[in-house]
Amino acid sequence: MPTPCTPLPLRRFLCALQTQASLFWCAWLCVAAVAAPALPNSVDMRLPKKLIATGWDKADTQRLRENIKLMEQRPFDGVFFSAVGKNDAGAPVQLRPAHSNQAWKREWFQNCIADLKATKFTRFTDNFVSIGANPGDVDWFDDDGWKAVVDHWRMAAWIAKQSGTQGVHFDPEPYTKPYAQFSYQAQAEKGKHTFNEYYAKARERGQQVMQAVVEEYPGITVYCYFMNSVNISATGQKDPRQILVQSGYGLFPAFIDGWLDVAPPGATFVDGCETAYHFNSEREYILHALHMKIACQELVAPENRAKYRAQVQASFGVYLDAYWNPPTSPWHIDGLGGSRVERLRINTTSALQAADEYVWIYGEKNRWWPTPNGGVNKETWPEALPGSEDALRFARDPVEFARAKIAEMKKAGILINLARNADFGSDKVEGNTGVQQDWKEGGAPAGWNVWQVSDSQGVFSWDREVGASAKGAARASKVVNGCFIQVADAKPGELHAVRAVVRLQGESAAWVRVRWQTPENKWTQVGQDVILPVEQTDDEWREVFGVAAVPEGVGKIV
């Protein structure tokens, strides 16, 4: 049986995320001569997970520059932003309607690059300049028109590269007549060309677009609200084109294939899976990540599938309004018996776990920062949907969020340790069942149980002379594989912050393992154990810190 290593003591951790109390464990341990090698300092092997903001309050480069300090206070790693240049007459020119036959000049957008270079980014590391497939009135066989479209894409990549931003954000959705860019049925010239002819031409145009893009920015990231995920219903067919011919985005897979034909290894593409707006379960995010990674390869030419697997990321969109809209709205996320803000936290967490790197947060009716858009309410999202900002902060980085909340509570004098004998300073303590437990000479500290494998001859004891901040520690000497244990009642959905301070001696190693039992004291949810290592520093006393969410069916945290 795996070692039931202890989570350590608890403090009440009140936050806007949920009504249940969350818990904070904290303890001091001294481990000596455990038979496990100490590990050298290493690089951070975690996959980066990032939240990108977008919506009706989207900033242009000027507002981004003017409001960056305020914007970076929000729980995001970057934004999709608009580029608005000025033509020779001084009139504004939007970069976003890129699929038009209008000729633009680079110098019209030099102000956007100047804005971005003058913006003092500290937190927003991943920012993307937005373009879209509108007005979409350039026929795929219009060579002159597509020269303009290709040049618009080139300008977007140029702006991104010259400003030091991450790349281009592409919205394929048609918002203006003729709503035609990727729909074969909407093509004005479909009477002259078959679907297969349009499909081949769309791939050629994709090649031209991406060749221009990577000439400007070889290491670009092209982040789409959706890619082949929008056509998942066409998979599972011998020839997906039989389905795509009727799809509103039936030509999009060919356009993407063209991208892949010419993309260098350093280019990255992100399928944002806008379909996720309705998702309300971990299963949906995992299933659609598999769809994007596996099934959607059927929409990619065989010669491009290895490149697709290597360079196309799975991402998800989270629609904030769905957690704010009334139940009568078709865009409504149910709380499933709890608060809708709690569902926002859970769903955003699931989205980040299933995504390769990015999740985009989209809002319409409320705002995160100043906007001139009259269709957006004056209220911020934290005002309109209390707890929403904390929900996103927790999902993005539970440890950072927990540390901040604990610091707030400590400053307010309301941080209470719920662990029993957490500082190892007492020889008497009330147990989990309410029965007093007295320390026994030569034994572990009062209130703590111990375990070690049968062939280990180590000693667990109470050391009254050492401690991280005061005298008192639990000591394990020559324990080959064992742990201190404490059990507490827990409820599904609770959030537990776990902290220990450890001193290692000799060739010892230690970690905290959080395990789960049913209310009947049976082990459960083994796959959701949480293991927290000791931080790699040169300090004498080193910290273990992490967060564990109580899974369904759990009644006790161990």
Where are these predicted regions, by residue range?
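N-terminal secretory signal peptides that target proteins for export/translocation
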Residues: M1-Q20
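Generic N-terminal simple sequence motifs
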Residues: T3-T6, A33-A36, E441
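Coiled-coil-like amphipathic alpha-helices with heptad-repeat character
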Residues: T6-P7, N41, A446, V459
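Bacterial N-terminal signal peptides
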Residues: A16-A33
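Boundary at the C-terminal end of the N-terminal hydrophobic targeting segment
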Residues: A32-P40, F424
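Glycan-processing catalytic domains of CAZymes
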Residues: L39-I414
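Extracellular and organelle-lumenal recognition/adhesion modules and their flexible linkers in secreted
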Residues: K410-V558
